[in-house]
Amino acid sequence: MSNIPAELKYASSHEWIRKEEDGSYTVGISEHAQELLGDMVFIELPDVGDTLSAGEDCAVAESVKAASDIYAPLSGEVLAINEALEDSPELVNSDAFGDGWFFRVMPSDVAEIDSLLDAEGYQAVIDEE
């Protein structure tokens, strides 16, 4: 059973978002997603300054099992990326909701957040897989 923190919002494609004090959102992949993928070997992230559209592929998580596209859960500008993943992609496995975050985005349309899932809704998505 994967850990699904209640304070986060989730996309059905297994990304999570966490609101930060400056109004930006940190994005990563869920513990469930990293369990499915297995040991990470490489993470390709967007560039700081990139403009993302919700639902577009914007990063790649490559594991010993597969390479998986990571989708932007929100539209907006990339403010920061987790440079630690360049040398330590395994942080996604060891701390998916903490040190294994992917990037931060300043949303251009906060209404998109309403279309994301709460923890209960995300659990239902996992249960249907």
Swiss-Prot record:
* Cofactor(s) needed for function: (R)-lipoate
Q: In its UniProt record, which GO terms are filed under biological process?
A: glycine decarboxylation via glycine cleavage system
Name positions with the PTM N6-lipoyllysine: 65
Q: Which InterPro entries does the UniProt record give?
A: 2-oxoA_DH_lipoyl-BS, Biotin_lipoyl, GCV_H, GCV_H/Fam206, GCV_H_sub, Single_hybrid_motif
**GO CC field:** cytosol; glycine cleavage complex
How is the cofactor bound, as the UniProt entry phrases it?
A: Binds 1 lipoyl cofactor covalently.
Function as written in the Swiss-Prot or TrEMBL entry: The glycine cleavage system catalyzes the degradation of glycine. The H protein shuttles the methylamine group of glycine from the P protein to the T protein.
This one is known as Glycine cleavage system H protein
